[in-house]
């Protein structure tokens, strides 16, 4: 009887460890996804294009920024329509109409500015 209990306890411990490892792998893959922001080609994109999961650049007609929002960062309004031209880590390339590319980390802005 004690061996059955010990066996069941060991089985539950094994399942717990496996589920924790699987959950940690899921969290790691999601964080890697956010580290690589420019996966879906881009630029200014009047009707599509753009950065960050298919959004449309600076937002002419089709939105922009993150996940299809209007400017940069979830729903801001891009150029025509106000709002949204903020770069979390600073602007790494300024074009004719303002910031064309946001920096992916804070140190990149410092490196870019020292080159000018």
From Swiss-Prot:
Residues 1-24 form the signal peptide. Residues 29-39 have a biased composition (Basic and acidic residues). Sequence repeats lie at residues 54-59, 62-67, 68-73, 75-80, 81-86. The keyword Secreted applies. It is found in: Secreted, Extracellular space, Extracellular matrix. It comes from the Eukaryota. One of its GO terms (cellular component) is extracellular region. Residues 27-83 are annotated as: Disordered. Pfam families: GRP (PF07172). The keyword Chloroplast does not apply. InterPro entries: GRP (IPR010800). Keywords: Extracellular matrix, Repeat, Secreted, Signal. Residues 40-83 have a biased composition (Gly residues). Its main location: secreted. Residues 54-86 are annotated as: 5 X 6 AA tandem repeats of G-G-G-G-[HYRS]-[GYQ]. Regulates the function of the receptor protein kinase WAK1. GRP3 and GRP3S bind to WAK1, WAK3 and WAK5, but GRP2, GRP4,GRP6, GRP7 and GRP8 did not bind to any of the WAK isoforms. PANTHER family: GLYCINE-RICH PROTEIN, NODULIN-24. Interacts with WAK1 (via the extracellular domain). Component of a 500 kDa complex, composed of GRP3 or GRP3-S, WAK1 and KAPP. Belongs to the GRP family. This is Glycine-rich protein 3 short isoform. It comes from Arabidopsis thaliana.
């Amino acid at each position: 009887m004690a061996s059955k209990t010990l066996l069941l306890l060991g089985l539950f411990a094994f399942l717990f460890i496996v589920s924790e490892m699987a959950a940690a792998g899921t969290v790691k893959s999601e964080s890697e996804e956010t580290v690589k922001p420019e996966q879906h080609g881009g630029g200014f994109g009047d009707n599509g294009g753009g950065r960050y999961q298919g959004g449309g650049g600076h937002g002419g007609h089709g939105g922009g920024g993150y996940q299809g929002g209007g400017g940069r960062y979830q729903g801001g309004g891009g150029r025509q329509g106000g709002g949204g031209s903020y770069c979390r880590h600073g602007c790494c390339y300024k074009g004719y109409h303002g910031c064309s590319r946001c920096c992916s980390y804070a140190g990149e802005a410092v490196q870019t500015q020292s080159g000018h």
